[in-house]
Swiss-Prot record:
Positions of (S)-timolol binding: D113, T118, N293, N312, Y316
SMART domains, sorted: 7TM_GPCR_Srsx
GO biological processes: adenylate cyclase-activating adrenergic receptor signaling pathway; adenylate cyclase-modulating G protein-coupled receptor signaling pathway; adrenergic receptor signaling pathway; AMPA selective glutamate receptor signaling pathway; bone resorption; brown fat cell differentiation; cell surface receptor signaling pathway; cellular response to amyloid-beta
Source taxonomy: Eukaryota, Metazoa, Chordata, Craniata, Vertebrata
Gene transcribed to yield this protein: ADRB2
PTM (free text): Palmitoylated. Mainly palmitoylated at Cys-341. Palmitoylation may reduce accessibility of phosphorylation sites by anchoring the receptor to the plasma membrane. Agonist stimulation promotes depalmitoylation and further allows Ser-345 and Ser-346 phosphorylation. Also undergoes transient, ligand-induced palmitoylation at Cys-265 probably by ZDHHC9, ZDHHC14 and ZDHHC18 within the Golgi. Palmitoylation at Cys-265 requires phosphorylation by PKA and receptor internalization and stabilizes the receptor. Could be depalmitoylated by LYPLA1 at the plasma membrane. Phosphorylated by PKA and BARK upon agonist stimulation, which mediates homologous desensitization of the receptor. PKA-mediated phosphorylation seems to facilitate phosphorylation by BARK.
Chain positions found as Phosphotyrosine: Y141
Protein name (database record): Beta-2 adrenergic receptor
Source domain of life: Eukaryota
Record note on quaternary structure: Binds NHERF1 and GPRASP1. Interacts with ARRB1 and ARRB2. Interacts with SRC. Interacts with USP20 and USP33. Interacts with VHL; the interaction, which is increased on hydroxylation of ADRB2, ubiquitinates ADRB2 leading to its degradation. Interacts with EGLN3; the interaction hydroxylates ADRB2 facilitating VHL-E3 ligase-mediated ubiquitination. Interacts (via PDZ-binding motif) with SNX27 (via PDZ domain); the interaction is required when endocytosed to prevent degradation in lysosomes and promote recycling to the plasma membrane. Interacts with CNIH4. Interacts with ARRDC3.
């Protein structure tokens, strides 16, 4: 987001030096510009490369094309726009110590900045709600949230984010009335984001705090339910093991089925942890900035401009973290390796459902259709335990020893 202040002091700039030798001061300034330029360029490259990789992987590999990963694609798009249209201009603003792109682009750039942050937090909020319904109502989930509905939700998220970001800024509802702000608005080389108190508080609440509270509340409920289900699984599997030990010893396939079905449930809980890490990282990166954003308009001189800019850039860096977090998922790791040509042949990945849309055929269609469905966790199915007891085998890979549905979306493990 735009920086507050008068535009004369920038993050980590050596302007405070009063060295007697002008040449030494100028040399230090050049070293600082080069060093910060390299660091900021690496940040931009990491954001763009990582999120292009995520978007391409989900678009190319059918196994990754789940409802949840549609939302992940939306999140990656927000991060990609941040890396292409926001961070580079923010870096230029800092390195050049002035704004050289004109007043129109200043407001447009600020609007895109707010848009990306708002779209990201709202998408994370939607993902939390998605996981809540998936874990609490796995049988109703697929009819409740189809891929077409997911596309509509994503479109609505971006429309709402666009309205809350572009409308107030382009209509100048954000503008402060004190003289320093008025001078900046009239100056083509000034792009400090002076805002009135009402806008700063309202935009922070609508764009960040409300979605954050919803996300934290819903995801805490998801983890409570996941913990309850894990405890239930542990207890029921213990009873089943004691009651059917001799039978399992007689039929090795049963033991294999039990182990495999248990892995489905554990994988889904690992997926929840990964999503929790994504949400937690986003919160840790952006919460300090939004706290300072409100404090700054209430007490102007309390927060140094350098601190404000530093916290803003910590938020920017978050856009490069998510692709690294996705590497926790074996599915994403395999997809990334395929895209980066780090695997010998995609044919070896058919067993994991990894065939690109262009190469998908009869060989892998059945497995892909089975695996890409987005049922979650475990729900009791009456009568299946009796079936297992009489037949000696688990009726399906997606049904565990106690008859619980353990289909999993393991693309985010």
């Amino acid at each position: 987001m735009g920086q507050p202040g008068n535009g004369s002091a920038f993050l980590l700039a050596p302007n405070g030096s009063h060295a007697p030798d002008h040449d030494v001061t100028q040399e230090r300034d050049e070293v600082w510009v080069v060093g910060m330029g390299i660091v900021m360029s690496l940040i931009v490259l990491a954001i763009v490369f990582g999120n292009v990789l995520v978007i391409t992987a989900i678009a190319k590999f059918e196994r990754l094309q789940t409802v949840t990963n549609y939302f992940i694609t939306s999140l990656a798009c927000a991060d990609l726009v941040m890396g292409l249209a926001v961070v580079p201009f923010g870096a230029a603003h800092i390195l050049m110590k002035m704004w050289t792109f004109g007043n129109f682009w200043c407001e447009f750039w600020t609007s895109i900045d707010v848009l990306c942050v708002t779209a990201s937090i709202e998408t994370l909020c939607v993902i939390a709600v998605d996981r809540y319904f998936a874990i609490t109502s796995p049988f109703k989930y697929q009819s409740l949230l189809t891929k077409n509905k997911a596309r509509v939700i994503i479109l609505m998220v971006w429309i709402v984010s666009g309205l809350t970001s572009f409308l107030p800024i382009q209509m100048h509802w954000y503008r402060a009335t004190h003289q320093e702000a008025i001078n900046c608005y009239a100056n083509e080389t000034c792009c400090d984001f002076f805002t009135n108190q009402a806008y700063a508080i309202a935009s922070s609440i609508v764009s960040f705090y409300v979605p954050l509270v919803i996300m934290v509340f819903v995801y805490s409920r998801v983890f409570q339910e996941a913990k309850r289900q894990l405890q239930k699984i542990d207890k029921s599997e213990g009873r089943f093991h004691v009651q059917n030990l001799s039978q399992v010893e007689q039929d090795g396939r049963t033991g294999h089925g039990l182990r495999r079905s248990s892995k489905f449930c554990l994988k889904e809980h690992k997926a929840l942890k990964t999503l929790g890490i994504i949400m937690g990282t986003f919160t840790l990166c952006w919460l300090p900035f939004f706290i300072v954003n409100i404090v700054h308009v209430i007490q102007d001189n309390l927060i140094r401009k350098e601190v404000y800019i530093l916290l803003n850039w910590i938020g920017y860096v978050n856009s490069g973290f998510n692709p690294l977090i996705y590497c926790r998922s074996p599915d994403f790791r395999i997809a990334f390796q395929e895209l980066l040509c780090l695997r010998r042949s995609s044919l070896k990945a058919y067993g994991n459902g990894y065939s690109s849309n262009g190469n998908t055929g009869e060989q892998s269609g059945y497995h892909v259709e089975q695996e890409k469905e987005n049922k979650l966790l475990c729900e009791d199915l009456p009568g299946t335990e009796d079936f297992v007891g009489h037949q000696g085998t688990v009726p399906s890979d997606n049904i565990d020893s106690q008859g619980r549905n353990c289909s999993t979306n393991d693309s985010l493990l």
